[in-house]
């Protein structure tokens, strides 16, 4: 009897151990098979009350509801906050107008409900500084909100950063009418937010709208979270010169040589690309220490309105690895995954996964040469650009052109996979033979199985 009880007890223990093991969830993996850190699953908001003393700007001489440009007064509040050990600079209900502001280590920005930090519509109010633009380190105009070397920097809402871009957009399109070859940089415009050389950055529950140029730009940052943000710029009717035109180059989030970035629960509608991976451009870009790769980028549970590309790699990019776009809804996007291939830049896009998307778009996958403002130089050892290990799976969408891909002697495409896809496709251009070692499994286009 005792023996039977012992055996039963041992069997029960074995069952409990086995059941316990079954309950342990296997870690999620990046496309290259390495584990995704638990950090990427944590969308807990920063508790602003833990960030230090509140510095409500109107308590320090800043006028509310005033059209006066108060850059000097607002910067004085930021500087005082830093000098007194750090804290949170608060924009209360109402609005204040400013040029370029520079946050210091230990300072943070909160914009309260119905509060607005509004950018000046005069470029003279934005400082010329050494900064980063279009894959280059150069002198250009600072953003409205700037933070360099600010580990732990936090921007939180629910109020608004309003770039007030109307005058800049109109000037841009007038300039283009006068000189159709004018560059983006020649039309002098500030960005809304520029954060550089910073770790553990959080931008949460804030409206960031109407940027004159790129909306958010992060350079050489690590562990960045964009959580629940509303990012918007108009896509048409910004100028009587040409009512079809929208807010030019108003990219939602530009990640420039950044690692470990989560964009979660955000809404993006801009007149350019949404989430963009950058890192350098030019024939020698891979040799420049100011440039760098984008790695471990997760875009999850977002909603896209009209954008040029939901997830765009390039064009100013040298190496992007372990990039995931998942569980998003798309409405009226021009492209979903856009791999821009610059003939003048050595580029390597690898281990990218797009999955669990619904909605509608013009083109889903685009891989084409990109030659806007490019300057090829002679280089004997110029590497051949390549795209490899690109996975697209679990997609249900209506497309005008699901597969917008072209071959070139300037780049190589290999090891793509398409799995569990059900789409409508007016163009009907799906041709996996254009890609080396392309795997197709359970792909249905216009009701016709393709594998």
Model-derived regions: residue spans:
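C-terminal structural cap/anchor segments
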Residues: 336-337, 343-402, 423
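Extracellular "leader-to-stem" segments immediately downstream of a signal peptide or signal-anchor
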Residues: 2-7, 19-90, 95-108, 112-197, ...
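Mature catalytic domains of secreted/periplasmic carbohydrate-active enzymes
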Residues: 122, 130-132, 202, 339, ...
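Hydrophobic h-region of N-terminal signal peptides that target proteins for export
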Residues: 11-19
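Right-handed parallel beta-helix
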Residues: 113-114, 151-160, 199-210, 222-236, ...
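Short glycine/acidic-rich loop motifs that flank beta-strands on beta-rich extracellular proteins
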Residues: 86, 99-100, 120-122, 164-168, ...
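A structural signal for leucine-rich repeat
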Residues: 370, 407-408, 432-435
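Active-site-proximal loop/turn and secondary-structure-junction residues that shape catalytic pockets
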Residues: 95, 220-222, 279-281, 315-317, ...
């Amino acid at each position: 009897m005792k023996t039977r009880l012992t055996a039963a007890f041992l069997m029960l223990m074995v069952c409990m151990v086995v059941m316990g093991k079954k309950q342990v969830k296997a870690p999620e993996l990046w496309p290259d098979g390495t584990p995704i850190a638990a950090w990427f699953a944590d969308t807990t908001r920063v508790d602003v009350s833990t960030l230090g003393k509140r510095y409500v700007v109107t308590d320090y001489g800043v006028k509310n509801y005033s059209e006066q440009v108060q850059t000097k007064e607002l910067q004085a509040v930021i500087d005082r906050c830093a000098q007194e050990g750090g804290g949170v600079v608060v924009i209360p209900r109402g609005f204040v107008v400013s040029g370029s502001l520079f946050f210091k280590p230990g300072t943070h920005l909160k914009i309260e409900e119905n509060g607005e930090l509004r950018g000046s519509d005069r470029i003279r109010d934005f400082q010329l500084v050494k900064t980063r633009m279009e894959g280059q380190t150069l002198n250009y105009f600072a953003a409205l909100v700037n933070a360099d070397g600010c580990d732990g920097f936090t921007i939180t809402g629910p109020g608004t950063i309003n770039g007030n871009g109307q005058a800049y957009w109109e000037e841009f399109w007038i300039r283009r009418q006068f000189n159709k070859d004018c560059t983006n940089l020649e039309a002098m415009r500030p960005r809304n937010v520029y954060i550089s050389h910073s770790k553990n950055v959080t931008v949460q529950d804030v409206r960031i709208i109407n940027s004159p140029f790129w909306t958010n730009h992060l350079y050489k940052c690590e562990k960045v979270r964009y959580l629940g943000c509303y990012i918007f710029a108009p896509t048409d009717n910004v100028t009587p010169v040409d009512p079809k035109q929208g807010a030019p180059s108003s990219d939602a989030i530009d990640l420039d040589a950044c690692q470990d970035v989560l964009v979660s629960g955000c809404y993006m509608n801009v007149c350019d690309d949404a989430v963009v991976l950058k890192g350098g451009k030019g024939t020698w870009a891979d040799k420049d220490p100011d440039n760098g790769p984008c790695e471990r980028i997760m875009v999850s549970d977002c909603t896209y309105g009209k954008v040029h590309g939901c997830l765009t790699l390039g064009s100013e990019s040298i190496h992007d690895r372990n990039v995931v776009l998942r569980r998003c809804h798309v409405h009226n996007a021009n492209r979903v995954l856009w791999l821009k291939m610059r003939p003048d830049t050595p580029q390597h896009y690898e281990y990218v996964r797009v999955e669990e998307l619904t909605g509608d778009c013009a083109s889903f996958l685009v891989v084409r040469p990109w030659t806007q403002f490019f300057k090829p130089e002679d280089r004997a050892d110029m590497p051949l650009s390549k795209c490899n290990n690109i996975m697209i799976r679990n997609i249900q969408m209506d497309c005008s052109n699901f597969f917008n891909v072209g071959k070139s002697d300037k780049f190589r495409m290999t090891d793509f996979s398409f799995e569990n896809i059900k789409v409508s496709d007016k163009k009907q251009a799906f041709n996996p033979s254009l890609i080396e070692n392309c795997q197709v499994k359970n792909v249905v286009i216009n009701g016709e199985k393709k594998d």
